[in-house]
C-alpha cells in the first residue's frame, strides 16, 4: 500500500474515532467500493502498439444519492493506490461541501509528452470505452 493511501485511510479512521462514528460505517467509508483495472492497447500513428495500465476507483457511495464525482489524469506516475487515494479525497471533498456524491478518480499510466495529440485522443477514447459498461 502506498503512503498516500495509508495516510488517507488512517485520517478517515481517526476522524471516525474522534466523531464517535460506528467502526463498521468507518470501514465502509475507508475502502473503495470498486476499482476497475484496465490494460489499454494503443495503436500509435506509426503502426506500433503499446500497452498502458489504467484504473478507475469508485471510492464510497455511502452518502451518494446522485452518483460519483471525480476526474482522471494521464501521467507516468499514476498507479492503483494513488488512484484509490485520490478517489477517497474526492469523497471527503464532496462530503465537506454537502454534495450528495461519492468520490471517484481515474488514471492512465502514460507520459503524454511522448505521444502525439492523436495518440492521446485515441488513448482517452480507449479508456472511456472500457468504462462504458461500468
Label the model's feature ranges.
Residues 1-134:
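N-terminal ligand-binding/catalytic initiation module
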Amino acid at each position: 500500500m502506498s503512503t498516500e493511501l495509508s495516510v488517507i485511510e488512517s485520517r478517515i479512521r481517526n476522524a471516525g474515532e474522534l466523531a464517535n462514528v460506528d467502526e463498521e460505517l468507518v470501514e465502509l467509508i475507508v475502502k473503495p467500493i470498486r476499482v476497475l483495472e484496465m490494460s489499454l492497447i494503443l495503436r500509435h500513428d506509426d503502426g506500433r502498439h503499446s500497452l498502458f495500465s489504467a484504473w478507475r476507483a469508485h471510492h464510497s457511495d455511502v452518502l451518494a444519492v446522485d452518483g460519483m464525482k471525480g476526474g482522471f489524469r494521464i501521467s507516468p506516475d499514476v498507479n492503483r493506490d494513488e488512484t484509490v487515494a485520490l478517489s477517497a479525497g474526492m469523497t471527503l471533498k464532496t462530503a465537506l461541501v454537502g454534495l450528495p456524491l461519492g468520490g471517484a478518480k481515474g488514471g492512465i499510466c502514460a507520459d503524454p509528452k511522448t505521444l502525439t495529440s492523436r495518440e492521446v485522443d485515441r488513448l482517452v477514447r480507449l479508456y472511456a470505452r472500457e468504462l462504458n459498461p461500468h
